[in-house]
Regions:
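DNA-binding patch around the recognition helix
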Residues: 76, 80, 94-95
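N-terminal leader segment of winged-helix/HTH proteins
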Residues: 1-28, 76-78
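N-terminal helix-turn-helix DNA-binding core of bacterial DNA-binding proteins
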Residues: 19-62, 84, 88-95
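Short, Lys/Arg-enriched C-terminal cap helix and immediately downstream tail that follows
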Residues: 77-79, 85-86, 101-102
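Short, hydrophobic-biased segments on the C-terminal half of alpha helices
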Residues: 70-71
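Short, Lys/Arg-rich amphipathic alpha-helical interaction segments
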Residues: 88-110
Length: 110
């Protein structure tokens, strides 16, 4: 089903909520991205910064593979990137995760 650009409510979800749910669901559907996101969340809770080098050390993936997966997580909003000196550090965006879970709950209640 195709939805027009204006904000339309479908089964109690707005178009932007539908876009959020589909984008985040697609991003987390890949097992590697789910594990990368969980790792970043865990390290951020411990007040640790996470860069690509850390992810390459923690996982058995090439740097290029991790970079591709991180682009998807950043694009959907689950991860924020902050450039500091020579490195790009990744931070879990818990606000987007909360909006996602709220939208999924709202959809499942209908």
């Amino acid at each position: 089903m195709r939805i027009r650009k204006k904000e339309v409510v479908i089964d109690s979800l707005t178009t932007s909520e539908v876009d959020l749910v589909t984008g985040v669901s697609d991003a987390l559907a890949h097992p590697a991205r789910l594990e990368l996101y969980r790792y970043i969340m865990t390290e951020n809770r411990r007040m640790n910064k996470v860069c690509t080098k850390d992810l390459v050390s923690a996982f058995d993936y090439a740097q290029a593979t991790i970079s591709q997966h991180m682009k998807v997580l950043v694009k959907c909003g689950l991860v924020d990137v902050k450039n500091e000196e020579k490195f790009a550090y990744y931070y879990a965006n818990l606000g987007v995760l909360m909006k996602y879970t709220d939208a999924v709950k709202k959809y499942s209640i209908v």
